[in-house]
């Protein structure tokens, strides 16, 4: 752990932001007001005069000093909260600069440590800034590289082409339905995912599905009564194809009966990520209900890697199930690859890209491994040897080159804390094959109603954009006990959120 002495007394939220900046350079760091023998020593100066925010930073390490200054003038006074954000950004700016000087590491995302950088781009776009003006702000005030700004520009262009009414889509809602079962739990996973076999034995799968039917009907009833339009539906989890074909059939029937005007829903996706759950019978059910967007996720095309991360299927099974789905009429298939999996380097990732090229799915999501706190991989980090920062960055470059050469375009992006190399996860697709749900959830432009185990509801105020969240219980037994209360709570929030909107 890097021990960093900060000679000023800062507010807790300032320390938190500066710690995020330090962690871009060091795997783990902690800022102290007082400590003996620090690894780094940092002096800050800052002031606000009228609407001008000025900061300076000096880093002392190993007898060397590194200096940086920054100043920005704003047109308006801003609220107290906005003033606080402005100063945190100004302090982040100079700390990032001195750490880049010291380490020689250039942070491509600059001071942006949040999950959704495209959301910031859309904010500037809605404020009326031109493309050139947005580029200048991102470069000067956020220190984002030209390469990443170009990536954001490409993504926003695809999003607006896919959803021309993106700025008005807050009048509609999308729905996420969580089925929390998987054949096994992967080592990197923190989603609500429970091995299906033991839950089947205890009867918990059947009881959960009974509750899920009820929740779908009750939420659907509210949507119909309030004449709400549904943009998209996403079945996730877990792996929703872990259950039997007959159980899937019954759920989709309830979906079509419960939600308003299903023929007008723009997109329905079913996450079939684990190839070992895909069967001809289940594919037939999907086709019966007009669902042709699914995910078949290899993650890697190296059997040893799959074994190491707890995915109990083979590479060949992934390939076979892809073609089974394709020959069953599935014409919009997504596949996922993960950069930085244990014991994988340039050679293994190139092999994964070569194998993907033989399949050519409609979309490809390239994830960078993130050490999430609750995952098996994080709890036992010493067991899993992963690539260094330079290798991970090279693999991301390989993915970008491969997608360009094969006619895929980036259309959504998100980042995570503790992600290898401070990189990003990017969704690519062939033109016209973009996922509507992925765009609306990443850009937080409309309410997502979460149904099922561990499902997160994200309520976006249709006029102010203010976001509130509600989480269903993660564990199946707790969900079974509490789902009725969860339904009541969500309907209560929906009534309050849309009361004014629905009476207009």
Where are these regions (language model features)?
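Radical SAM enzyme core and accessory elements
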Residues: 1-131, 164, 427, 431-504
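A C-terminal junction/extension of Radical SAM enzymes
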Residues: 31-40, 374-451
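N-terminal [4Fe-4S]-dependent radical SAM core
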Residues: 102-106, 126-176, 226-227
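Short, conserved phosphate-binding/catalytic loop or strand-edge motifs used
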Residues: 113-119, 156-159, 192
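Beta-strand scaffold of nucleotide-dependent catalytic cores
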Residues: 178, 295, 364-368, 439, ...
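Local cysteine-cluster metal-coordination motifs and their immediate loop/turn environment
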Residues: 178-193
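Conserved non-cysteine loop/helix-boundary elements of the Radical SAM core domain that shape
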Residues: 193-398
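Short, glycine-/Ser/Thr-/acidic-enriched flexible segments
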Residues: 240, 418, 454-457
């Amino acid at each position: 752990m890097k021990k960093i002495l900060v000679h000023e007394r800062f507010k807790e939220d300032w320390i938190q932001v500066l710690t995020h900046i330090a962690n871009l350079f060091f795997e783990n760091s902690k800022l102290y007001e007082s400590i003996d023998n620090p690894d780094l020593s940092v002096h800050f100066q800052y002031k606000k005069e009228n609407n001008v925010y000025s900061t300076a930073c000096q880093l002392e390490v190993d007898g060397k000093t590194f200096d940086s200054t920054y100043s920005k003038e704003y047109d308006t006074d801003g609220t107290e909260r906005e003033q606080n954000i402005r100063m945190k950004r100004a302090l982040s700016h100079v700390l990032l600069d001195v750490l880049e000087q010291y380490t020689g590491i250039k942070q491509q995302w600059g001071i942006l440590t949040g999950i959704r950088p495209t959301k910031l781009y859309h904010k500037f776009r809605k404020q009326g800034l031109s493309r050139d003006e947005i580029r200048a702000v991102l470069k000067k005030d956020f220190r984002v590289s030209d390469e990443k700004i170009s990536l954001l520009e490409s993504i926003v262009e695809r999003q607006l082409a896919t959803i021309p009414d993106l700025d008005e889509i807050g009048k509609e809602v999308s729905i996420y339905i969580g089925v929390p079962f998987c054949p096994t739990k992967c080592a990197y996973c923190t989603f609500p995912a429970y091995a299906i076999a033991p839950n089947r034995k205890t009867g918990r799968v059947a009881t959960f599905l009974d509750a899920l039917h009820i929740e779908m009907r009750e939420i659907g009833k509210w949507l119909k009564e309030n004449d709400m339009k549904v943009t998209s539906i996403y079945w996730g989890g877990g792996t929703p194809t872990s259950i039997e074909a007959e159980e899937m059939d019954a759920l989709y029937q309830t979906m079509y009966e419960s939600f308003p005007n299903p023929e007008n829903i723009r997109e329905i996706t079913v996450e079939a990520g684990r190839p070992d759950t895909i069967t001809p019978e289940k594919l037939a059910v999907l086709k019966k209900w007009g669902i042709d967007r699914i995910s078949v996720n290899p993650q890697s095309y190296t059997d040893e890697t799959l074994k190491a991360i707890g995915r109990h299927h083979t590479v060949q099974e992934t390939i076979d199930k892809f073609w089974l789905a394709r020959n069953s009429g599935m014409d919009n298939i997504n596949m996922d690859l993960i950069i930085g999996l244990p014991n994988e380097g340039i050679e293994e990732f190139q092999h994964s890209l070569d194998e993907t090229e033989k399949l050519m799915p409609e979309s490809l999501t390239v994830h960078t491994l993130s050490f999430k706190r609750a995952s098996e991989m994080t709890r036992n980090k010493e067991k899993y040897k992963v690539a260094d920062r330079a290798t991970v960055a090279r693999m991301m470059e390989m993915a970008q080159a491969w997608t360009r050469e094969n006619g895929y375009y980036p259309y959504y992006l998100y980042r995570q804390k503790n992600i290898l190399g401070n990189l990003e996860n990017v969704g690519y697709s062939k033109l016209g094959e973009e996922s509507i749900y992925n765009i609306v959830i990443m850009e937080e432009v409309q309410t997502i109603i979460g149904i099922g185990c561990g499902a997160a509801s994200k309520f976006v105020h249709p006029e102010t954009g203010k976001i509130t969240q509600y989480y269903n219980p993660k564990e199946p037994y707790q969900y079974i006990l509490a789902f009725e209360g969860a339904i009541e709570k969500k309907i209560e929030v929906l009534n309050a959120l849309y009361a004014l909107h629905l009476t207009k």
